[in-house]
């Protein structure tokens, strides 16, 4: 059985036991989280939400909080000696999916 959930403005296809990286959640490592925005549930029977599936939830456990690799932006003006260098590291949360309730 699998489900498609929405969190952080993105959609993720998840199965029980799978580890996923999502946008940062306000939860510490070891906390339980529940995703209630489930737009699709597949398996023996298929349920499609309009926009979400009624009563469907996905439960998971937060494994860790972290930051992604650095993304560097570099701008420059030719022949002027002007340049700007900036870096950004996006925070993320690693979640292990425990159960899919449909």
Swiss-Prot record:
A Gene Ontology BP annotation from the UniProt entry: translation
PROSITE patterns: RIBOSOMAL_L21 (PS01169)
Residue spans crossing the bilayer: none
InterPro entries (alphabetical): bL21-like, bL21-like_sf, Ribosomal_bL21, Ribosomal_bL21_CS
Gene Ontology molecular function: any one: structural constituent of ribosome
Region forming the signal peptide: none
Cellular component GO terms held in the UniProt record: cytoplasm; ribonucleoprotein complex; ribosome
Keyword Disulfide bond attached: no
Keywords: Ribonucleoprotein, Ribosomal protein, RNA-binding, rRNA-binding
Cystine bridges: none
One Pfam family cited in the UniProt record for this chain: Ribosomal_L21p
Similarity comment: Belongs to the bacterial ribosomal protein bL21 family.
Function: This protein binds to 23S rRNA in the presence of protein L20.
UniProt cross-references to NCBIfam families, sorted A to Z: L21
Subunit structure: Part of the 50S ribosomal subunit. Contacts protein L20.
Protein name: Large ribosomal subunit protein bL21
Name of the encoding gene: rplU
């Amino acid at each position: 059985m699998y489900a498609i959930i929405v969190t952080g403005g993105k959609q993720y296809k998840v199965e029980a036991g799978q580890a996923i990286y999502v946008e940062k959640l306000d939860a510490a490592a070891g906390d339980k989280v529940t995703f209630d925005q489930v737009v699709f549930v597949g398996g023996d029977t298929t349920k499609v939400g309009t926009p979400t599936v009624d009563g469907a939830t996905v439960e998971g456990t937060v494994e860790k909080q972290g930051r992604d690799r650095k993304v560097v932006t570099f701008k420059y003006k030719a022949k002027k000696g002007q340049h700007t260098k900036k870096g950004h590291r996006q925070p993320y949360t690693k979640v292990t999916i425990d159960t899919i309730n449909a």
